[in-house]
Every structure is written in C-alpha cells, then in structure tokens.
Amino acid sequence: MIKPLHTKIEEIQNLKDGYLIRESYFEYPKGKSNIYKVSLSKKIDWYAELPFEDDVYSNPIILKENHFICASWKGVDSHISLKDGSIIESKLTRWTKKQSEQEDQPNVFHSLRSFQT
C-alpha cells in the first residue's frame, strides 16, 4: 500500500514501472507538486513540474501512452512526460480579469510551454 506524503491520495494510476499519484491539493505544501511517480519499490522517481510555482493540480489525471494531462487550480492544462515529470506542453484555459491585473501576472504566458506534435 502506498501512503500519502502530505494529505490524502485522491487518485492512483497504475503504470508498467510504478504508480502515478495525485494527492489532494487542499492544504498541500505550497510550491510542491501534488502529483508524483512512485516506483514499484515504493520510492519517489519524480514530482510533476508545476505550471506556476504556487499552483497545484486539482483535476483528474488523463493517462496517455507516454504522458498524462492534468489541469491545475489556476486553469492550466499541462501535458506531462511520464519519463521525468516535466511539462512538454501547457495551455492556459482560464483567465480572469482579477488575475490579469495582478502585478506578478503580466509575463504568465512566457512561462507556458508548447510543443509541436
């Protein structure tokens, strides 16, 4: 059995070489990813890269062949590599006037990556 690191496990996806875990984002430590891969020997292989440093993954994982997709609390759909947890593509799907007026948000689009298929 896999034990959560910080909150409670919301989702487990079985992989060939381990497990993909999504913990509850509620009260999860800020700046840490709540999605991570655990090996068959129960060691953490990697944490999924966050689209923003202060974001969390709040939606179910959509598992694909070599990556997975998950939406964040701030409205970013991220395609994340199953190899190392890095973001290979991300798309901002939600944006509010309040967010766009914040001083730390003007360069938000520079932190988003896209990848050619």
Language-model features, listed with the residues they occupy:
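Secretory-pathway ectodomains
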Residues: 1-117
